[in-house]
Amino acid sequence: MAHVTDFKEAGFNTLLEELEWRGLISQSTDRDRLAEALNGEPITYYCGFDPTAASLHIGNLVQLINMRHLQLAGHHPIALVGGATGLIGDPRQSGERTLNPKDVVAGWADRLKNQIGGILDTEGANAVRFVSNYDWTASMTVIDFLRDVGKNFRLGTMLAKDTVARRLNSEEGISFTEFSYQVLQGNDFLHLFDEYHCTLELGGSDQWGNLTSGLDLIHKVRGVDVNVFTSPIITDASGKKFGKSEGNAVWLDATMLSPYKFYQFWINRPDVEMESLLKAFTFLPKAEIERLVEESKTNPGKREAQKTLAWEVTSFVHGEAATQAAIDASGALFGRGGNLEDIDEEMLESVLDGFKVVDENGEHVFPVSKPGDRVIDAAQAAGLFKSASEARRAIKSGGVYLNNNRIEDEEQVLAEADFLAGRFALIRRGKKALGAVENR
């Protein structure tokens, strides 16, 4: 696929023009001032990532994509992993965050750095710089904080921030800890401005109030107008935010969501979302995206747009090798090429996870089968048939497969060699109905 290295190759006159076309900017400071900053000499910009979980998610991915666009244009990125703010957590729309132990937060911070470093360039003239706000916040006394930082914030302005206002009007209210978050984030921007002449902050649209805290602070104490812009919040089909606190997170860490499942998330997006997702989540040129969108309208059954989207985003996050392995595993699973025996155990477990059944305790598990068990019994256990007689009829009609091999004998039993990686046997009914049993 034709990747681009900057906005000109993508078919745009300026970087800001490209970001706006891709729908990557929700709100910003004065557009002319922002355009002048982005189109001039390289600037230093930053985005903050709080380690409130062990992984980033696709809501954060939008920020990383924006950072990557700016990095490709020659600007200098700073990734702030919030060692201090991560101990507090920014206020949510509802409910206080659980405070995590310091050692847990520190471990999560290291994991986030590794994820970010896998996406942004870590070498070269504009390599990403990692900083932690714990380094300049932890040593600050309460008196210093109140005198040097807090003195510059007006309570009326702080109370008017959207999230704060909502929380104040709710039953649970808001703690002083979370209320103070915007002051800490504002101080972060000031520190990075002083230390690295950082003049632009990026964030999600739900962070607008926190971003403008730094904007106002720098204007007040340094007399300089800096810039901020936010990206839109990604939502699911019901309009709910995709995020780690919403229970349906699409994680970027391969140990928390496998590349296979990550790929499946993108390839299963509906046609109506193709234009916005291809624009926002890929680096394909404008002309190629427009072609794919048109193709999805005229030939939706081909699903070229979905396949391209899934490949582009998964390879961006997990690399091409892991993405190809996920595609090969999917093809092998349905007998569309590839060899089931070539899939490693970790990938197998991930691929087959959706074929678990609910046991008597309400747990999702793989049904158990052993060498010597009949295939028809294993197929029933996997939920493919309601009775042995139904399974027998399907075998007679040639519609039952064990590891993609048609079953001819109604009394065939599972052999040791039928368990892939020594654990899983895949049973298929027809072309699409799949089940799996585990030897344990």
Curated annotation (Swiss-Prot):
Signal peptide: none annotated. A motif ('KMSKS' region) lies at residues 241-245. SUPFAM superfamilies: Alpha-L RNA-binding motif, Nucleotidylyl transferase. Its EC number is 6.1.1.1. A motif ('HIGH' region) lies at residues 51-60. GO terms for biological process: tyrosyl-tRNA aminoacylation. Residues 373-439 form the S4 RNA-binding domain. InterPro entries: aa-tRNA-synth_I_CS, aa-tRNA-synth_Ic, Rossmann-like_a/b/a_fold, S4_RNA-bd_sf, SYY-like_C, Tyr-tRNA-ligase, Tyr-tRNA-ligase_bac-type, Tyr-tRNA-ligase_bac_1. GO terms for cellular component: cytosol. L-tyrosine binds at residues 46, 181, 185. The keyword Transmembrane helix does not apply. Keywords: Aminoacyl-tRNA synthetase, ATP-binding, Cytoplasm, Ligase, Nucleotide-binding, Protein biosynthesis, RNA-binding. ATP binds at residue 244. One of its GO terms (molecular function) is RNA binding. Pfam families: SYY_C-terminal, tRNA-synt_1b. It comes from the Bacteria. It is found in: Cytoplasm. It catalyses: tRNA(Tyr) + L-tyrosine + ATP = L-tyrosyl-tRNA(Tyr) + AMP + diphosphate + H(+). NCBIfam families: tyrS (TIGR00234). Belongs to the class-I aminoacyl-tRNA synthetase family. TyrS type 1 subfamily. HAMAP family: Tyr_tRNA_synth_type1. Homodimer. Catalyzes the attachment of tyrosine to tRNA(Tyr) in a two-step reaction: tyrosine is first activated by ATP to form Tyr-AMP and then transferred to the acceptor end of tRNA(Tyr). This is Tyrosine--tRNA ligase. It comes from Bifidobacterium longum (strain NCC 2705). The lineage of its organism: Bacteria, Bacillati, Actinomycetota, Actinomycetes, Bifidobacteriales. The gene is tyrS.
